[in-house]
UniProtKB/Swiss-Prot annotation:
It comes from Schizosaccharomyces pombe (strain 972 / ATCC 24843). One of its GO terms (biological process) is carboxylic acid transmembrane transport. Its main location: endoplasmic reticulum. The chain crosses the membrane at residues 40-57, 83-103, 109-129, 140-160, 170-190, 205-225, 278-298, 311-331, 338-358, 366-386, 399-418, 428-448. GO terms for cellular component: endoplasmic reticulum; membrane; plasma membrane. This is Uncharacterized transporter C1683.12. Belongs to the major facilitator superfamily. Allantoate permease family. The lineage of its organism: Eukaryota, Fungi, Dikarya, Ascomycota, Taphrinomycotina. GO terms for molecular function: carboxylic acid transmembrane transporter activity; transmembrane transporter activity.
Length: 482
């Protein structure tokens, strides 16, 4: 790498000739690069955020439907409702790893729009469910259709943005998942006013309205999402040139666009992937337990009415949305992931201890706010962390797929441990997972620090390099994000 005096700074008036040297010798003017990133944000992030909002809304609306009469109309026992919640993840997790490996082959705009149309139709037809087994079937189908959506969005973000830019962009998605909880509660509250004489139960209209909105939104992806962000139609020639420079500067991180079984196998030999999966499982169990069952916790455990439970869940989700944005923004600015995950989890620990230690409704309601603080940022930052530290593309795609598959197994468990009120088993399990997740994040942080030190010692000639081959994130000049 050249020194700062030797680097060529590319400003608006400068054109790039590859024959002049390597892209590593080129630094884009900061103001111009910031303008490019803002343009990418304005085009891509509203699309991704709205669509992830809708996917989370369609997935989690069973919690709101239960509060407004689904369980009574279908005559569901507590174990049947829990099973219906959990079974979604049985098919959801099977779709994740194949999706991140196939999305490049079929093109993101076709692949993602097909997913959206699929889950929209399943959501709409859920309004006709009249017994337990038909509800289970729709949940299984919904899992198949939604399974690869979030991992593919995460992968697309890693293709478009630099490592230090990714946390904030994933935060946008999680902000929307927070507000889907709040929005779902408000919709459910409004639908309690629709008379049953309209031909459908109140919860049936919930599925129809949300499914139709999702179906229409599929057109946005189909016609507006570029398969390759560096050649997007919304970029002018100068911006495409800058995207090419950014891509070349990240070549070790991105790697070859062709599928490589070697990188697939290397992912499974990497300790980072396994630690990331443990963290994801633990944080996802808390996320799915609270995001799905919060209205039921407020109604059945804290004793509030159905209407009050829906209203009172809104500010809890809103706090989670604010938290994920602020924490991920700070994480990007400091380029630190691990300490934020570890530190935020202490709020969750305090919240679950309160829920387990007292039956006072006011104290328990305050505890839900403490739990909301780390609920979304810890999940978002762990995904960003593994995205940042796995390279090239197909090693990262494999690790991300496994991360999401293992993480979403927690959805199956959450539905079983949050089976019936009082939810002491669920809260205890979530407390234990928070402890394990915190300890694993601490171990991963120090492991990465140690690996960075080893690489630097090899570069300094202080240690013999025992690896015969180094590529991607194993390269000596690839510095792990802590």
């Amino acid at each position: 790498m050249s020194t700062m005096e030797e680097e060529k700074v590319i400003s608006k008036s400068t054109s790039v000739d590859i024959s002049e040297g390597t892209f590593d010798d080129i630094t884009i003017e900061k103001k111009e690069e910031a303008k490019l990133v803002r343009k990418l944000d304005w085009y891509l992030m509203p699309m991704f955020s709205v669509l992830y909002f809708l996917s989370f809304l369609d997935r989690a609306n069973i919690g709101n439907a239960a509060v407004v009469g689904l369980k009574e109309d279908l005559k569901l026992q507590a174990y049947q409702y829990s099973a219906a919640v959990s079974v979604f993840y049985a098919t959801y997790i099977t779709a994740e790893t194949p999706s991140v490996l196939l999305v490049k082959k079929f093109g993101p705009h076709y692949y993602l729009s097909a997913m959206i149309i699929g889950w929209s139709l399943v959501t709409i037809f859920t309004c006709f469910v009249r017994h337990y087994w038909s509800l289970v079937l729709t949940r299984l189908l919904l899992g198949i259709c939604e399974g690869g959506f979030f991992p593919c969005l995460s992968l697309y973000i890693s293709m478009t943005y630099k490592r230090e830019e990714q946390g904030k962009r994933l935060a946008y998605l999680y902000v929307c998942s927070c507000f889907s909880g709040a929005f779902g509660g408000l919709i459910a509250t409004g639908l309690t006013k629709i008379p049953k004489s309209s031909g459908l139960p109140n919860w049936g209209w919930l599925y129809i309205i949300e499914g139709l909105i999702s179906a229409i939104s599929a057109l946005w992806i189909l016609f507006c999402l570029p398969d390759d962000p560096s050649t997007a139609r919304f970029l002018n020639p100068r911006e495409k040139e800058l995207m090419k420079i950014r891509a070349e500067q990240r070549q070790k991180y991105m790697g070859s666009p062709n599928f490589d079984w070697t990188q697939f196998r290397k992912a499974f030999k990497d300790p980072k992937m396994y630690m990331s999966c443990v963290i994801q499982f633990c944080q996802d169990l808390v996320l799915y337990g609270i995001s799905t069952f919060l209205p039921s916790i407020l109604k059945l455990e804290l004793g509030y009415s159905s209407l009050a439970a829906q209203y009172m869940s809104v500010p809890v989700y809103a706090l989670g949305g604010i938290s994920v944005y602020v924490i991920c923004l700070l994480s990007d600015r400091t380029n630190i992931r691990g300490w934020f995950i570890i530190g935020m989890n202490f709020f969750g620990l305090a919240g679950f201890i309160i829920l387990l230690a007292t039956t006072n409704s006011a104290a328990n309601y305050v505890a839900t706010y403490l739990i909301a603080l780390p609920l979304y940022p810890t999940v978002a930052l762990n995904i960003t962390w593994i995205n940042n530290n796995m390279a090239p593309h197909y090693r990262r795609a494999t690790a991300l797929g496994c991360n999401q598959t293992i993480g979403n197994l927690a959805g199956v468990i959450a539905g079983q441990v949050y089976r019936s009120s009082p939810y002491k088993l669920g809260h205890g399990f979530a407390l234990g997972c928070t402890v394990v997740g915190t300890l694993t994040a601490t171990a991963m942080r120090f492991y990465l620090q140690r690996q960075n030190k080893i690489k630097q010692e090899i570069l300094n000639g202080e240690r013999v390099d025992e690896k015969k081959e180094r590529d991607g994130c194993d390269a000596l000049d690839f510095v792990y994000v802590l």
